[in-house]
Amino acid sequence: MKLLHIDSSILGDSSASRHVSAAAVAQFRKKDPSVEVISLDLASDPLPHLDVEALSWLGKDLTPDVSGRPELIAGANALKDFKAADIVVIGVPMYNLSIPSQLKAWIDRIMVAGQTFRYTSGGGIEGLAKGKKVVLAVARGGLYGEGSPAASFEHQLSYLKSVFAMIGITDLTVIEAEGLATNGGADRARILSDAEQKASAL
């Protein structure tokens, strides 16, 4: 079994999403010590954002004349590792109502027509990445959940749910550490501990 572990927070060891994603990965390792973990830190080793050339190579085998280009290799490997993974664990902080741009750059490498989804003759979309389990370790400073005053501003989790639904993922687990900065951060430790416990119970 292969597990792809992705972190996207720029905050290093002080990142809530990193703590929760690490707890989830530790639990999967505990349940199956033979699991092969591939780690991708999009903060310390970011993928470049798409340009015209990178777009033209999405989902294609690199030819010898470009096979030495690090940015193209990184994009090809991102898609390869995602397709090979049985489980994907992603640490996702909220930045300015949405996801980090580093994570968006990764998504742009794995959402590839003909590889992870296809357009049907009737104008619909069929996901081709079925059968994977995805765990989202979501961290937010404020309260953006359903029923909260700021719910309409939330474009983090709702966006990711759409992304993974489009490519055929139906086994999606969300672990939220929300409200980390409310009350001056007084509840941060408790909120983070609760989220880590949920991750450890996967």
From Swiss-Prot:
Residue numbers binding FMN: 9, 15-17, 94-97
Domain of life: Bacteria
Reactions that this protein is recorded to catalyse: 2 a quinone + NADH + H(+) = 2 a 1,4-benzosemiquinone + NAD(+); N,N-dimethyl-1,4-phenylenediamine + anthranilate + 2 NAD(+) = 2-(4-dimethylaminophenyl)diazenylbenzoate + 2 NADH + 2 H(+)
EC number assigned by the record: 1.6.5.-, 1.7.1.17
InterPro entries: Flavodoxin_fold, Flavoprotein-like_sf, FMN-dep_NADH:Q_OxRdtase_AzoR1, NADH:quinone_OxRdtase_FMN_depd
Keyword Oxidoreductase tagged: yes
UniProt-recorded Gene Ontology molecular function terms: electron transfer activity; FMN binding; oxidoreductase activity, acting on NAD(P)H as acceptor; oxidoreductase activity, acting on NAD(P)H, quinone or similar compound as acceptor
Family in the record: Belongs to the azoreductase type 1 family.
Protein name according to UniProt: FMN-dependent NADH:quinone oxidoreductase
Protein's gene: azoR
